[in-house]
């Protein structure tokens, strides 16, 4: 061993004494040898070497980065699974799955026989404090989730319903006008590219200078504006802590004195609530408006259910709408066909079984929600918009051709201890808004011939949706 150390020291001293040209040459040779040796290891000797996938993905992060930058990452993963099977190696130390079983095993609740798959480095970011979504520590996440959960309880959501109804009515009042989005919605969509750039920079550190140089000034300004907006919300809410009579999402966070909450920590939670509470619902509703406009028979069935049940839009409470079977089927189908989070959420294997395979400890794994929800062996005519697949067998519109669909393969809000905390709020928002819209308006797609929805979809951390031109006709004033 001492001989090896002495030889290494002598080699380094020799490099220092050599000319810069010779030193550069030596480093070039060493770098080349290192790359070749690493490539040989990754292709033939790495623990994941037996898993199929694109050759470039086994060697480097470039395959991953190329498809993220192109905005078609969910579709690239789907194509990889179509070509290579249910388990695909998508990076040197990363596997993608597309089965319903893997969903439960990677993201499901921890048991005595099921070790937790913690979140990967994808969630690391450059803000002082992580929000609940980015928190990788299971204990800290559990504490924060417990505090926030009170704001999403059935009792709390019942208290929030009047606010949701108020804003859905405001939306309906603006439908016939050419109204622009609020700036924070635009900001979230535009700044979604930051998620892509940060992820590529993390995987390919040598590209950081190029990424920072190419970052558009407009996006940075919008993101700073969004942070200022969230910070103002936090400061206003903290100042009103002792005067509010209704419990909101921050009530328990501020009331808990077991540990101090800095403004940065509160800001991180506010960012999550604003983004998750706006982009997800907006994406789902836009998708539903498009697909219903493109499938007038589905829109008609939805309107018949609502218009035959309710005399006034104000009668549409969340509790009553939960019983509208076709409405709920439409929403589930919209979430399946365009899931809000379309890529596999990365987790780190603790050295556990997934889909009957022992995945080495430290391997990054995920299940692609887009790919799983579009498998033809899980969903009959998976590319088609068919709310009927979600109806019970006794419903008049139930169709036997969907009876073997694997409905649990659609997980738009993930599942388990890290599943979406606001899922019930999201469903309430979608039910109330879509129900009132379909009760009050007819609508049709104006640019059907110029629009290819799926081919125009782009994913940059958030969906960038095509722009459907829809003409609305007011039926109930």
UniProtKB/Swiss-Prot annotation:
Its cofactor is heme. Induction: Expression is positively regulated by the oxaleimides biosynthesis cluster-specific transcription factor poxB. Heme binds at residue 420. It comes from the Eukaryota. The chain crosses the membrane at residues 24-41. One of its GO terms (biological process) is mycotoxin biosynthetic process. Gene3D superfamilies: Cytochrome P450. CDD domains: CYP60B-like. One of its GO terms (cellular component) is membrane. Pfam families: p450 (PF00067). Belongs to the cytochrome P450 family. Cytochrome P450 monooxygenase; part of the gene cluster that mediates the biosynthesis of oxaleimides, cytotoxic compounds containing an unusual disubstituted succinimide moiety. The first step of the pathway is provided by the HR-PKS poxF that serves in a new mode of collaborative biosynthesis with the PKS-NRPS poxE, by providing the olefin containing amino acid substrate via the synthesis of an ACP-bound dec-4-enoate. This is Cytochrome P450 monooxygenase poxC.
